[in-house]
Swiss-Prot record:
Domain Era-type G: 4-171
Topological category with respect to the lipid bilayer: Peripheral membrane protein
Known partners and oligomeric status: Monomer.
GO molecular function, one term: ribosomal small subunit binding
Binding locations of GTP: 12-19, 59-63, 121-124
Lineage: Bacteria, Bacillati, Bacillota, Bacilli, Lactobacillales
Name listed for the protein in its UniProt record: GTPase Era
Length: 299
């Protein structure tokens, strides 16, 4: 029996459901999710393996017009995947008309030397007539290998998309062990789970200004708990106040919710210590970006 494998990039504007799709396919949380745009900042691999094939999905940051050095990093990180994959999934939402952001991405995709599949997500939110209009509009913009409507939250038609991807795989190596599901270390996943709770619980001005640094992560041999010390970085004192909350209530809530997710992922009891620090304008300082895990070497 021949083994097939390939790399698949998931591209699109912010908030179209790329991470939701990846988590659904993997059957567990690999990429954090929130209703805030630009939640994903780093490229994240989801490694899907069966006895017959391995598909390495690369979830990318939402492509937008960058306003900071962090934004530049995110967009370049997304586009750089075009150089390293066999297929691109270009994801668009069924419930929003084609916009300038979509057109900008398609101009780059037209230059790509790999097949592009249009994935129209969130079909559960629209009438079939509206979906057909959306598909027709995009079909006129460029030549897609396939067009597949799905609902990543409900799983509608995701199996069909997976069948198409499997059909288009070439014979190849198994690049990763069968039990490995992502390329990122546990520390990265832990920091992302904490950041997800900050995004979920805080107001609009906070999300883009937050980074999470894991200062230490080790098992206590006496309690058999994993001790994690994490620092939440923000850009302004006012943001620090919001995250700490009245008498520390917000920070406690963030920690409690994050700890539950981390325990599920690690399969261990966790003692989580969280601190908040101000680092002014860190999103525009390359040294700070590298310190907080946003490194140009990634692309």
């Amino acid at each position: 029996m021949t083994f097939k494998s390939g790399f698949v990039a998931i591209l699109g504007r912010p908030n179209v459901g790329k991470s939701t799709f990846l988590n659904y396919v993997m059957g567990q949380k690999i990429a954090i999710m929130s209703d805030k745009a630009q939640t994903t900042r780093n490229k994240i691999m989801g490694i899907y393996t069966t006895e017959e094939e391995q598909i390495v999905f690369i979830d990318t940051p939402g492509i937008h017009k960058p306003k900071t050095a962090l934004g530049d990093f995110m967009v370049e990180s997304a586009y750089s995947t075009l150089r390293e994959v066999d297929t691109v999934l270009f994801m668009v939402p069924a419930d929003e008309k084609r916009g300038k952001g979509d057109d900008m991405i398609m101009e780059r995709l037209k230059q790509a030397k790999v097949p592009v599949i249009l994935v129209v997500n969130k079909i559960d939110k629209v009438h079939p007539d509206q979906l057909l209009e959306q598909i027709d509009d995009f079909r006129q913009q460029m030549d897609f290998k396939e067009i597949v409507p799905i609902s990543a939250t409900q799983g509608n038609n995701v199996n069909r998309l997976m069948e198409i991807l499997k059909e288009n795989l070439d014979e190849g190596f198994q690049y990763f062990p069968a039990d490995q599901i992502t390329d990122h270390p546990e520390r990265f996943l832990v920091s992302e789970m904490i950041r997800e709770k900050v995004l979920h619980l805080t107001r609009e001005e906070i999300p883009h200004s937050v980074a999470v640094v894991i200062e230490s992560m080790k098992r206590d041999e006496f309690t058999d708990k994993v001790h994690i010390r994490a620092t939440i970085m923000v850009e302004r004192d006012s943001q620090k106040g919001i995250i700490i909350g009245k008498q520390g209530a917000m920070l406690k809530k963030i920690g409690s919710m994050a700890r539950r997710d981390i325990e599920l992922m690690l399969g261990d009891k966790v003692f989580l210590e969280t601190w908040v620090k101000v680092k002014k304008n860190w999103r525009d300082k390359k040294l700070d970006l590298a310190d907080f895990g946003y490194n140009e070497k990634e692309y």
